[in-house]
Amino acid sequence: MELSEPKQRFESLLSLFEDVANKRYSGDFSVKKNINAPQVPPRSYSLFNVTGGNVSSYNNQQQQQNNNNNNNNNNNNNNNNNNNNNNNNNNSGEISSNNSTPSILFSPTPTSTAPPAPPQPTTPPNTGFHNRPLSININQQPIGGVNNNNNNNNKDSPSNKPLRLSGSPPTASINGNQIEQLQRELRNEKEAHQQTKYLLNSFADENKKLSNDCQLWRAKYFKLLTKNTKLKVIFDHFQSIMNESDSVPGEGSLVHSTSYNSSSSSSSGGGGNITPRKLSLAGGGKFDDAPQSASALLKIHHQRNQSTGSAFSNTIYNGEEKTRDTISYNERPKRQTVGSSTFFPPPPSRATSTSSIQVNSDPQEIEQLTEEQYLEMLEKRRQVSLQILQTEKEYAFYLNIIVEEFLQPLKNESNLSNNPFISKAQVKQLFGDTEVILGSSKLLAEDLENVLLDGTSNPIGLGDCFLKICDYFKLYASYVKNYYTSISVLNKLKEESHKFQAFIQEKEQILLDSNFTDLGALLVLPVSRIGQYTSMINYLFSLTPQSHPDYEPFKKAVIKMKSTVDYVKEKIRDNDSQNKVRIIQNQMTGKFENLNLPHRRYVREGMLTESGKGSNSNQYYCFLFNDIFVLSTPIKKSNQFSFKKKISLSEAEVTMISDPEDRPIFQISIQNIDSQQDNSPNMLSLNGIQNAINNMTNNDSKSKNNNNNNSNGNNNNNNINSNSNSNNNSVIDIKSSGVLINNGGGSGFISNNNGITNVNSNNNNNNNINSNNNINGNNNNGNNSVNYSNGEDNNDRECFTFIADSNRDREDWIQAIHANIISSKKRNETRKPEDIEKGGIDFSVSDIKLCEQIGSGGSGCTVHRCTVDGFTCAVKVLKLKNTSPFLVEQFISEITIMVKLSHQNIAKYLGHRLSGNQLWLFMEFYPHSLKDVITKRTSPFPATEVIWMALEIAKGLEFLHTQKNPIIHRDLKPGNIMCSLDDKGRVCSIRVCDFDTSKELGNGVTLKTCIGTPCYMAAEVLNVADGGNSGYSLKADIWSFAMLCFEIISLLPPYHQFQHLQSIEMIINGTCPPLPTDLIQPKLLQPLIELLVTCIDLNPNHRPNASQLVQKLTKMLKNTGMMTE
């Protein structure tokens, strides 16, 4: 159906209704007869709802009104009904202006009983047809008569006149079905439009979702790409280490083969047509036969590395001639990228290290290369050299940032400021030799630029450049060793100094446009760069023909560089191992001796199951160090371990045995306690230490004699007895490597390589025992065991049998334990008694660095933190010049006392030495003193912590007082109690220290020297000057212990609110120091306070001794519910 005809009909209907509305306001309701107008039905039909087009009789009006709430017109009685008896009668007739009113037709609500207002002759108001609040459905054709419901009985009223409709199309031309069809089409169009809109919104949402998914996948891709690159770097590093471990290079062991050497089979035949060997690079690119562009030489991945990776990516010049310019280290290089690989790709596998570089001494080798191949080789050598120059410039640029932006301003702050937030010592610890390293980097870059940018295609002198700079690479050793200290100082300053933190944050803003986030990421650059120099030199060496003038300098540079890097790597491994020992020390709980010793190194750890009788088996988490084997049990829901047992490897043997159930079992045996000699460092004779002290006081600097190592010819040939019984069980005791055996009537040979011995045991007369990491037992009902022993009787040994996770795990454990048993025994054979007493520090070769001052001693000495071969410890330094002999003797007495002490609550003695005019005493380092903790604390300690701290101090005091010759401390106070803090800030690892005023007491000996800190001194110590006083003894420490505990409770020194003379008088009278009233948990503290009051009794005999204190404090701690060991 076409749309033009219905449209015309709509327009006609609209004009009709507009005319009717206009005539209503003008008062002219006469409608002329129109032939084309639709015929109005008789008046028996009422047009009661124009909007709906529904026509019904009056009898149906009430029902229609109930069903349709939208009908706004209520039908009333017929206008022609003048009688009250004819209310329900409907009259029919033609519509005229005398009995019909258009106001009823268009009124949205039923009309009121009041007569309508007279028509206005003026212009119709704004409430025209289109502005009236009536919703008219013009899609329906008005049919039927108009029912006038006006209640006005005046027939002559204009409102009662009949109405003639005109201007409408004929009835025959208006089809209701067509209108309804048009409506449906319009509705369909509208629905189609809404559906299209919905689809567009759906597509937009789906597009957004796909975009987010693409971003996620892109992030995952780059993450996997980063992991892949890191794994490749690790693999290349592992491959280089494996190649380096093949052999140790020497001057005469280098056999060079050029990069274009073919295989031995190719080179054996004559002729010059030899295919050049392709060199694979780390980035995925490779050198082909012809020179390639930079993009083909190396594939660069731009990745961000914030901490430990290399600083720069693998960049290469494009081979074009560069104009020579001045090196600037203040301008950022053009290419700044960060890669997780090295600055420079590692050389090929045949040239990864010095040990794998082969230099052929055949002078005819160079003649095998054609001229074209030789020139290509030199060109690639030049390209690699340009790449090294570029990366060296970038490296120097970032070093210059460290020096100019950080180091120099901090130096000025420490030197010129009246109140510096950083000291000179901290600046030195933080940056080390960065300035010297920057100078060496600039020197290398300038030398390389002078050689490479001279316009020649065959630069000569590269070998001399690296040989010259190799001596400077030794500076990296001290920097790498100091790196961990540098990072710890940096973190500590950030935490403690707001000014330093603000300074660092301000300076780090210049790194926003780089790939480094902070100063710590810059400080790691020299650590990673030193390893890259080796790859650079080795790679250039592999590209240098033997006939080239740079060959010999490069060979010397390779040897020098390898020795330097090996030393640096060894120090890095030592630092990592020592850090691991410190971590294990903090994770261990229970009663155990200090694990953190200078010579101790971490080896491995893992879970082992102890094989017990029947079904009894205990699981231990074992830690293997280079001198001890520690058994512990993991604590559930914690990263801590409970200490169980320590096995000294110098007295141990490891045994690999087979099991009928084919379980991976091995055994560790140690000498029984009854038969062991106490070789504890602090329990040895004091002759060695006393001699050392005498030498120091006499300023004797004579060198010590070398150790005499006597060896006999039977070291490598020992007998092994294999006795066979009825079950064909064979046991082989291996006492050394390379031994002959005699098994019954047969003979065989056993070889032991790398600490791993494998036994092939057969019932033949001839037995061969090879080192193949397997044990094959072909005996009937037989068990084989291999014992690593020192020839002692096994009846006096205690055995521990463990089950490993697998055979491979068992072999790894046995290999590691056996290797460290051998090294531990060798160290004990060569160490002197005084060296053992010093805790394993060899001061003659140790690298000792004095760090910041952390305190001062009572004998005129200073206390510093220091590092001994990277191991952090505390040192007391006494200057002998212009120092009274009394103070020197006091210092020596402290050393003599500390040598004898070994307890978990006593500071550990590590060693001493005489250096020039200074006497050094090395002790275990603790970061805090109890005085520092009390001063910084803002709220009182909980009662359980107070009791625990008092118990730990009492244990240390008990150890001193119960020695064979009791030791009195005489200066017990918070400043002489060292401690650590756990991750929650609670006090832990309490140690009693500072024994410069301590004294050994004999039986019945009393002291009469007034010494100590006044507010902590006992009354009898203050009265020692009186003639009637008989002196004091160990009970004076009990008084000082009470005063120390009063300060822990109140967080204030005893008698702090009184003047000095008043406090002395109160002490002499035995008055207890006042305590604050706002104590935490006073009921729990009440027993402790009562105990402390007994400790300050004026009669020393009425005071409890140290052992009684420990017993009572332990009982108090149990009553609080706090677990103790």
Curated annotation (Swiss-Prot):
The protein's Enzyme Commission number: 2.7.11.1
Active-site residues from the entry: D971 (proton acceptor)
What protein is this chain from? Answer: Kinase and exchange factor for Rac B
Q: Which residues bind ATP?
A: I854, G855, S856, G857, G858, S859, G860, C861, T862, K876
Q: PROSITE patterns of this UniProt entry?
A: DH_2, PH_DOMAIN, PROTEIN_KINASE_DOM, PROTEIN_KINASE_ST
Segments of this protein annotated with the region Disordered = 50-175, 247-287, 322-362, 693-729, 761-791
Top-level division of the source organism's lineage? Eukaryota
Query: From the UniProt record, which GO molecular function terms apply?
Result: ATP binding; GTPase activator activity; guanyl-nucleotide exchange factor activity; metal ion binding; protein kinase activity; protein serine kinase activity; protein serine/threonine kinase activity
Q: Which segments show compositional bias classed as Low complexity?
A: 59-91, 137-161, 694-729
- Which reaction does this chain catalyze? L-seryl-[protein] + ATP = O-phospho-L-seryl-[protein] + ADP + H(+); L-threonyl-[protein] + ATP = O-phospho-L-threonyl-[protein] + ADP + H(+)
Q: Which UniProt keywords apply?
A: ATP-binding, GTPase activation, Kinase, Magnesium, Metal-binding, Nucleotide-binding, Serine/threonine-protein kinase, Transferase
A cellular component term, taken from the record's GO annotations: cytoplasm
| UniProt keyword Kinase present | yes
The cofactor named in the record is: Mg(2+)
Domain PH per the UniProt entry, residue ranges? 601-822
Where do Pro residues bias regions lie? Answer: 113-124
The answer to whether UniProt assigns keyword ATP-binding to this entry is yes
Q: Write down the species.
A: Dictyostelium discoideum
